[in-house]
């Protein structure tokens, strides 16, 4: 797939986030045998990264799946395997079914806080 300037800008933003919020901490997290998912996911949600292809009315960006692919590709810059896997579970396993099949009530209660 050929990325547009918008795809590339998203990747630059994700890589900058990785360089400042993830990679400097990976070794310490692994040494302490922790993964501060709640803290990290809140930062990622605030940056819009957890709702790239989720509906805007629930806090997502409402973009098509090609932007999610660009995001996942950028996660390859993380200096470990577990963190991108956890992010992928959140963005591509846990929330898609809720976004697609959940009632409006469930989306408001569970989807919105999990992507924002």
How would you describe each model-predicted region?
Residues 1-6:
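Intrinsic disorder at enzyme termini
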Residues 23-116:
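Glycine-rich flavin
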Residues 14-15:
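Short amphipathic alpha-helical coiled-coil/interface segments
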Residues 10:
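Mature N-terminal segment immediately following signal peptide/propeptide cleavage
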